[in-house]
């Protein structure tokens, strides 16, 4: 990801305030509600039949935390996202057969969740930096597919 020093600072400063458990669960839940076809990858998580069921599904919330924990690790290696996410890219491509477009969708949802939680602090400049980061992470996760 090609970020300026100021953008890197904005991203890491805001990320230091993120409650990974709360926002991870919200981001993955929103993905599954807004894009219901993504639920097929999580059928083993139990009841995902309604938005309410998804929003209160403990396995969805726990996996959302896991996803954002990995995302946070990626933020420590912004200059090597492909290397950082190589194993996850391979897993999602070869074993889970996840459509790589879903990574982009989740990134978009994450930006919305960050904006909702941080309000005025999530300025247009911060949003622009995060848009670059989520695009870079989605690209890194899709790397094995190419």
From Swiss-Prot:
GO MF term list: haptoglobin binding; heme binding; hemoglobin alpha binding; metal ion binding; organic acid binding; oxygen binding; oxygen carrier activity; peroxidase activity
CDD domains cross-referenced by the UniProt entry: Hb-beta-like
Positions of modified residues (N-acetylvaline): 1
Domain Globin span(s) in chain numbering: 2-146
Binding-site residues for heme b, renumbered to this chain: 63, 92
GO biological process: hydrogen peroxide catabolic process
Expression sites (tissue/organ): Red blood cells.
Modification Phosphothreonine occurs at: 12
Stored Pfam families: Globin (PF00042)
Source taxon at top rank: Eukaryota
Residue list for modification N6-acetyllysine: 59, 82, 144
Matches recorded under InterPro entries: Globin, Globin-like_sf, Globin/Proto, Hemoglobin_b, Hemoglobin_oxygen_transport
SUPFAM superfamilies associated with the record: Globin-like
Acetylation recorded as keyword: yes
Keywords attached to this entry: Acetylation, Heme, Iron, Metal-binding, Oxygen transport, Phosphoprotein, S-nitrosylation, Transport
Job description of the protein: Involved in oxygen transport from the lung to the various peripheral tissues.
Family designation: Belongs to the globin family.
Protein's recorded name: Hemoglobin subunit beta
Organism: Loxodonta africana
Phylogenetic classification of the source organism: Eukaryota, Metazoa, Chordata, Craniata, Vertebrata
């Amino acid at each position: 990801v090609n970020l300026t020093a100021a953008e890197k600072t904005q991203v890491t400063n805001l990320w230091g305030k993120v409650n990974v458990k709360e926002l991870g669960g919200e981001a993955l839940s929103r993905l599954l509600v807004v894009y219901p076809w993504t639920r097929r990858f999580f059928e083993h998580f139990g009841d995902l039949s309604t938005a309410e069921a998804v929003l209160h599904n403990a396995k969805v919330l726990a996996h959302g935390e896991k996803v954002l924990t990995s995302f946070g690790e990626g933020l420590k290696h912004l200059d090597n996202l492909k290397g950082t996410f190589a194993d996850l890219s391979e897993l999602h491509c070869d074993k889970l057969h996840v459509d790589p477009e879903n990574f982009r969708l989740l990134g978009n949802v994450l930006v919305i969740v960050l904006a909702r939680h941080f309000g005025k602090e999530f300025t247009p400049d911060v949003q622009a930096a995060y848009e670059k980061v989520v695009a870079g992470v989605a690209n890194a996760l899709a790397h094995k597919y190419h």
